[in-house]
Amino acid sequence: MTTETNAQEAEQSAVPSAPRKSFGGRWTYGVIIMAFLFVLMPFLFWNATWFGRPLTDTQLGLALANRSHPREIQHALAQIEARMEAHDPGVRHWYPAVLALANDPVDEIRVTDAWVMGQDNTSQDFHHALVGLLTDSNVMVERNAALSLVRFGDDAGHAQIVAMLRPYTMASPLAGTLETRLKPSDVVNPGTLLAHVESPGGRKEVRATVPGTLERWLAQNGTAISAGQPLLSLQPSESMVWEALRALYLVGRAEDLPDVDRYARGGDGFSPQVAQQALAASRAIRSRATS
């Protein structure tokens, strides 16, 4: 750079830039309000769906009686579970309501209820209710009941637990023409839309009943299917496998070893912790078989 060039640059930098127009007070307040709403709305949604938000006894009673909002009942059940884990002596006041929900017509409520009843293995009323839920119309209710029964030292749900380690065949709930929506390797959760079935009565949805990964369709897209016909195969989710292996550590039998050892070898896209749990379950089963 020459001295002349430096002088020119200094002169240019000394020239004040043209003043920018202000947004004005209204625009400023508008931006602040919008920013606040962007923060507030996700919080309100989270606060309304997060089951960890504590409830007073009054709120708990109102939530359990809120038949128009099943998630409020689920929230109440989650709070009852938290009180059980904290060994709150007053939680037994809510046990009759928990027992009554075992017969609730809403599947999601029974799924949660079956899990919550397993948190107090001293309640024989819970024990009896869980045995009844092993034949529930919803497979997730059956599975949660089977896992909860293990806490009572009861392996009556052994078959349901072992099934959690295997692919799940989902049957069509109705007859009609199949319109598949997902492809193999897609991950699903209970409630995920899998397909539509076109019938004279209209276009109906088919949703997943268990979590997992779509292995393959057992019926072809565009073909006629009947109610009860095998529709697809789902590989089990990691959470299902993990819970089943934890249960089989306690109640597994020698005939379960082929299913357990498959996970002990690792793979299937699962975390190393699953293989470690499978190995622990395998050792526990072998120890019981030889003792």
Describe each PLM feature range.
Residues V162-L178, L193-G212, S233-P236:
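Short beta-strand-turn/beta-hairpin segments enriched in glycine/proline and small hydrophobics
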Residues E179-N189, W217-Q229:
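Acidic, glycine-anchored pre-beta loop/turn
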Residues I73, R110, E142-R143, V241, ...:
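Residue-level detector of extended alpha-helical repeat arrays and alpha-solenoid scaffolds
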Residues M1-R20:
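N-terminal intrinsically disordered, acidic low-complexity segments at the extreme N-terminus
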Residues W50-L64, E85-N103, N121-T135, D154-P167, ...:
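Amphipathic alpha-helical scaffolding segments comprising HEAT/armadillo-like alpha-solenoid repeats
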Residues E81-A82, G118, V150, Y249, ...:
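Structural signature of alpha-helical solenoid repeat scaffolds
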Residues A76, D113, A145-A146, A244, ...:
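Conserved hydrophobic register position within alpha-solenoid helical repeats
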Residues S68-H69, P105-V106, S137-N138, T169, ...:
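Short inter-helical turns and helix N-cap capping residues of alpha-solenoid HEAT/ARM repeat scaffolds
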